[in-house]
Swiss-Prot record:
PROSITE patterns: FHA_DOMAIN (PS50006), PROTEIN_KINASE_DOM (PS50011), PROTEIN_KINASE_ST (PS00108). Its cofactor is Mg(2+). Residues 220-486 form the Protein kinase domain. Its EC number is 2.7.11.1. It holds the Pfam family FHA. Changing R318H: In prostate cancer; uncertain significance; somatic mutation. GO terms for molecular function: ATP binding; identical protein binding; metal ion binding; protein homodimerization activity; protein kinase binding; protein serine kinase activity; protein serine/threonine kinase activity; ubiquitin protein ligase binding. Homodimer. Homodimerization is part of the activation process but the dimer may dissociate following activation. Interacts with PML. Interacts with TP53. Interacts with RB1; phosphorylates RB1. Interacts with BRCA1. Interacts (phosphorylated at Thr-68) with MDC1; requires ATM-mediated phosphorylation of CHEK2. Interacts with TP53BP1; modulates CHEK2 phosphorylation at Thr-68 in response to ionizing radiation. Interacts with CDC25A; phosphorylates CDC25A and mediates its degradation in response to ionizing radiation. Interacts with CUL1; mediates CHEK2 ubiquitination and regulation. Residues 8-22, 506-517 have a biased composition (Polar residues). This is Serine/threonine-protein kinase Chk2. It comes from Homo sapiens (Human). Residues 368-394 are annotated as: T-loop/activation segment.
Amino acid sequence: MSRESDVEAQQSHGSSACSQPHGSVTQSQGSSSQSQGISSSSTSTMPNSSQSSHSSSGTLSSLETVSTQELYSIPEDQEPEDQEPEEPTPAPWARLWALQDGFANLECVNDNYWFGRDKSCEYCFDEPLLKRTDKYRTYSKKHFRIFREVGPKNSYIAYIEDHSGNGTFVNTELVGKGKRRPLNNNSEIALSLSRNKVFVFFDLTVDDQSVYPKALRDEYIMSKTLGSGACGEVKLAFERKTCKKVAIKIISKRKFAIGSAREADPALNVETEIEILKKLNHPCIIKIKNFFDAEDYYIVLELMEGGELFDKVVGNKRLKEATCKLYFYQMLLAVQYLHENGIIHRDLKPENVLLSSQEEDCLIKITDFGHSKILGETSLMRTLCGTPTYLAPEVLVSVGTAGYNRAVDCWSLGVILFICLSGYPPFSEHRTQVSLKDQITSGKYNFIPEVWAEVSEKALDLVKKLLVVDPKARFTTEEALRHPWLQDEDMKRKFQDLLSEENESTALPQVLAQPSTSRKRPREGEAEGAETTKRPAVCAAVL
């Protein structure tokens, strides 16, 4: 007996506690008293920071500047007590709700589950009631598997992988033997025939798709939360046509208007600014792929799998000089391009430099550019209440924004280079009795000789040329690119190779899954068999 009505009740009633043991398989009875919890809010596994909200697609500081993260060491905790705390019971990350008798509900606690007739499967099709059905013979020994993998910011992405002869379907679309597809919340899973719906998949870590505008849902599948801030959040998403990952920045119009007096400041015209930023095209600048203006703003950005430069520096304590050179060369190219197009970033910091991969040698991209255009004068003054570690001296001593020019970005680049080479910030209120503002405005940075002993004189010289208090005497991006430290042909060749690899990967067409021609077991109904012929696999969601 079909129990799809129970699932509809589950979808409409929201989250409730589940009484079944974690990771258990429970026989489905078609009762509304069964566990019906659906997560109504995102529970990202990303590490939180008390200093800054950020994401792998960039921080939210293009629309609000948050307090800058600090690099100083955290004091060690006191010695733990002798008694070790009990291990917490793992919470399920997903739930499969059975739609037919003979199948059982499943709460997913482990990272991998096989489904099929084989006894080795974690979810074995061995119920006597199921074995008596005609469809049982069409199921494979290992029909499909559901698993999750670590994605951006240590969040997880759920996938379904087809290993059957007669097909596994997600929302009536064939996955294709040997192919995988991201599995999003409320997806319906059918076996052998697209109409033979067996499970509904509930991702307990993400929001329901229905809360997003239809125009957005038509093109993208929304997934995990990657970062959040006072005015919005950043979500991982998948393009429906290609299944490629993207990052979608969501800005709350209501919170943004309240927080920045938007109506009183015409500079806060997000729509106009987005149109300008969409025209920017540089390999070292995050590309805006799409924009949706609904109840909130939705900005679709390319996803950077390597995360933030800040995390890279913290994780490694400091970067190799060769790595610093490769990254900094790209930063200079990006900022030079912005300046040539009349844009001053004014919020350059390691959190706004994203890495294309976890590899040591990789492309970087500047994000949250256009800060100076999106934020008005009043809002910018509020950002100075935070820790201005990367702000140029002229910003701290000026009243309002008058007098700012592109030199402020070059100062920030100098601070970033200092941090990458040494592993600590040049200016910090935690290391001296001198106020942070006085340190910056006097240009007296914290120089530790034993740390810098491993850094070349050329690299240190470039840092000094950028951290000049007088903006007129400070190095420009053009001068920095001509500096002897960056006249490294091997480094430039490596950058070009990485660029070529990226261009090749983005140019390759998406290989769509094709149906299997295997007919080891009978397929029910010849007419139904035609459903799986030459059907391209696409990302899909129940909307």
